[in-house]
Swiss-Prot record:
Disulfide bonds: none annotated. Heme b b562 binds at residues 83, 182. Heme 1 (or BL or b562) is low-potential and absorbs at about 562 nm, and heme 2 (or BH or b566) is high-potential and absorbs at about 566 nm. Its cofactor is heme b. It comes from Cryptoprocta ferox (Fossa). This is Cytochrome b. Belongs to the cytochrome b family. InterPro entries: Cyt_b/b6_C, Cyt_b/b6_C_sf, Cyt_b/b6_N, Cytb/b6-like_sf, Cytochrome_b, Cytochrome_b_C_euk/bac, Cytochrome_b_N_euk/bac, Di-haem_cyt_TM. Gene3D superfamilies: Cytochrome Bc1 Complex, Chain C.
Length: 379
């Protein structure tokens, strides 16, 4: 009898994806984030399922139901905070994962990269709708401000916003549909993840050298399963430190005030992982221009493979491109900081400068540095 691991139709798929998968022997810890994202997704679905058992998506009771989860449900507080802070860990891993792809030229695997961009948009939509559900002040006003941006679309904008709201303002209908979408989207994300992996396993993984590694591969298990477990332990350590010692560190105090349409908070801002895009949006005085810049700040990733001018795949041996990538990281950190600051001098100016720097770095400076480095190779 043949090994069931290799002959059973279902187990064979798992075997070829996680056990006998030929993997480059030199991939570093930067390749851990894919598996960590899978764990984050599973954790979010699991904690979210238990939260959904006790949550009510009605404007009159939503805030109270979240309070009830934290106070009265067995271990409800830890489930709620694991879900809220799990989203932060999810986005930390997403940013690391995308940054790895940029640094090592993984974007040359175009199908995998493009599915990844669709995944990023879907994850961001899910997180945004999840932030609305507790129905605190920042939930309500965040939903109002962000959905209202669609009114900048010519001709259909206003109708589109009212269609999304299900009325003339963010109200009961909005909350109910956001809960429905927030529940279904993680399963759509899971399906997209399967497609992401399907495309990845068609070509095989990239590696730090950027060279073809067909001549030097090792089985995924036990080498990388052990390595992934180490990464997982560190992730759980960070998450539980956050959940058990300062669960509200990354949240907004305004969200502990029930939503009130008659009282606007002094500073409306989204969760920290959207602040870079929010800062770009705010730095453009024109509404439509701001919305376009907001979308393009993520969509620009789709153009990155087309702008690859270097003869080398990764940035491992390209110091000039490395400098530019770290400049981009610094710029994104600056934008994240600015997004959380009030709209006043000097923050407006800093935000505008950081936004101006963001797009040319990716669209102009990086391709030019690739050309210069090609010249240096023949110098």
């Amino acid at each position: 009898m043949a090994n069931i691991r290799k002959s059973h139709p279902l187990i064979k798929i798992v075997n070829e994806s996680f056990i006998d998968l030929p993997t480059p022997s030199n991939i570093s810890a930067w390749w851990n984030f894919g598996s960590l994202l899978g764990v984050c997704l599973a954790l979010q679905i699991l904690t979210g399922l238990f939260l959904a058992m006790h949550y009510t998506s009605d404007t009159a009771t939503a805030f109270s139901s979240v309070t009830h989860i934290c106070r009265d449900v067995n271990y409800g507080w830890i489930i709620r905070y694991m879900h809220a802070n799990g989203a932060s860990m999810f986005f930390i891993c997403v940013f690391m994962h995308v940054g790895r792809g940029m640094y090592y030229g993984s974007y040359t695997l175009s199908e995998t990269w493009n599915i990844g961009i669709i995944l990023l948009f879907t994850i961001m939509a899910t997180a945004f709708m999840g932030y609305v559900l507790p129905w605190g002040q920042m939930s309500f006003w965040g939903a109002t401000v962000i959905t209202n941006l669609l009114s900048a679309i010519p001709y259909v904008g206003t109708n589109l916003v009212e269609w999304i709201w299900g009325g003339f303002s963010v109200d009961k209908a909005t909350l109910t549909r956001f809960f429905a979408f927030h529940f279904i989207l993680p399963f759509i994300i899971s399906a997209l993840v399967a497609v992401h992996l399907l495309f990845l396993h068609e070509t095989g993984s990239n590696n730090p050298s950027g060279l073809v590694s067909n001549s030097d591969k090792i089985p995924f298990h036990p080498y990388y399963t052990i390595k992934d477990i180490l990464g997982l332990l560190l992730l759980i350590l960070m998450l539980m430190l956050l959940v058990l010692f300062s669960p509200d560190l990354l949240g907004d105090p305004d969200n502990y005030t029930p939503a009130n349409p008659l009282n606007t908070p002094p500073h409306i801002k989204p969760e920290w992982y959207f602040l870079f895009a929010y800062a770009i949006l705010r730095s453009i005085p024109n509404k439509l221009g701001g919305v376009m810049a907001l979308v393009l700040s993520i969509l620009v990733l789709a153009i990155v493979p087309l702008l690859h001018t270097s003869k080398q795949r990764g940035m491992t041996f390209r110091p000039l491109s490395q400098c530019l990538l770290w400049l981009l990281v610094a710029d994104l950190l600056t934008l994240t900081w600015i997004g959380g600051q009030p709209v006043e001098y000097p923050f407006i100016t800093i935000g505008q400068l950081a936004s101006i720097l963001y797009f040319p770095t990716i669209l102009i400076l990086m391709p030019i540095s690739g050309i210069i480095e090609n010249q240096l190779l023949t110098w």
